[in-house]
From Swiss-Prot:
InterPro entries per record: Cyclophilin-like_dom_sf (IPR029000), Cyclophilin-type_PPIase_CS (IPR020892), Cyclophilin-type_PPIase_dom (IPR002130)
Residue ranges constituting the PPIase cyclophilin-type domain according to the UniProt record: 96-253
Disulfide bond keyword on record: yes
EC number assigned by the record: 5.2.1.8
Compositionally biased tracts (Polar residues): 1-13
GO cellular component annotations of the record: chloroplast; chloroplast stromal thylakoid; chloroplast thylakoid; chloroplast thylakoid membrane; plastid; thylakoid; thylakoid lumen
Organism: Arabidopsis thaliana
SUPFAM superfamilies membership: Cyclophilin-like
Gene name of this polypeptide: PNSL5
Inducers of expression: Down-regulated by pathogen. Up-regulated by light.
Region annotation Disordered: where it falls in the sequence: 1-21
Name of this chain's protein: Photosynthetic NDH subunit of lumenal location 5, chloroplastic
Length: 259
């Protein structure tokens, strides 16, 4: 069984030696290598493996500088929502529960999707929300959370970032990069490199412009950003997995007249 070695070092304390994490099973992986590099307020993480991994694992090169972002609503002290970049054509929702083994309902996240700009990507996400193809997001978890960065979910097969599939097959190509990671609430596809989109996605909690041209943006949180922040604030283990299960207890599509 092949293993993946992960080294984590803290740029805030350069004198501290890197911390070694336990090996991660990569027997299901099907690509070659991936790297997540973070700069600024959070840790630098690098991954390497001679064993391929699935196209569902998130590849991000991150360097965070705080900038101002435009807002169109402030629904609570915890909720600041970035202005939509384009016309919203569909609305979907996640009802989120947090806790072990069965969580307490934490609230609803409503997401607007940009179907005119990225119709294939939007249709994939919409159908996974409704479950109309016989599989989808209901009952899956947010398996990876990095504060001041993003929350990641969508692996309804394995729940660890190595599974998931699109409604078109295992993966599909990057549709385009018309839209940008302009601020909190932006919804974007996780991938393992170019043209490896499946079902995994992430919701930004900051502006992440360094991801432009690498990940396909296709939606925006329009209600429930306080629930996104609640997920972001969950305690995580050294692999960025929330210690309490964060589950999409229910999900689906909303009429355009509803928010």
């Amino acid at each position: 069984m092949a293993t993946l070695s992960m080294t984590l070092s803290n740029p805030k304390s350069l004198s501290a030696p890197p911390r070694r994490l336990s090996p991660i099973n990569t027997s299901a992986f099907t690509s070659t290598s991936f790297r997540l590099r973070t700069k600024s307020s959070f840790d630098s993480i690098s991954f390497s493996s001679s064993t391929p991994f699935s196209a569902s694992s998130l590849l991000l090169h991150t360097s965070y500088t705080k900038r101002n972002h435009r807002c169109f609503s402030v629904q609570s002290n915890a909720e600041v929502v970035t202005e939509p970049q384009s016309k919203i054509t569909h609305k979907v929702y996640f009802d989120i529960s947090v806790g072990n083994p069965v969580g307490k309902l934490a609230g609803r996240i409503v997401i607007g999707l940009y179907g005119d700009d990225v119709p294939q990507t939007v249709e994939n996400f919409r159908a996974l929300c409704t479950g109309e193809k016989g599989f989808g997001y209901k009952g899956s978890t947010f398996h990876r959370v990095i504060r001041d960065f993003m929350i990641q979910g969508g692996d309804f097969e394995k729940g660890n970032g190595t599974g998931g599939k699109s409604v078109y097959g295992r993966t599909f190509k990057d549709e385009n990069f018309k839209l940008s990671h302009v601020g909190p609430g932006v919804l974007s596809m996780a991938n393992a490199g170019p043209n490896t989109n499946g079902s995994q996605f992430f919701i930004c909690t900051i502006k992440t412009s360094w991801l432009d041209g690498r990940h396909v943006v296709f939606g925006q949180v329009i209600e429930g950003m306080e629930v996104v922040k609640l997920i972001e604030e969950q305690e995580t283990d050294r692999g960025d997995r929330p210690r309490k299960k964060v589950v999409i207890a229910d999900c689906g599509q909303l009429p355009m007249s509803e928010a």
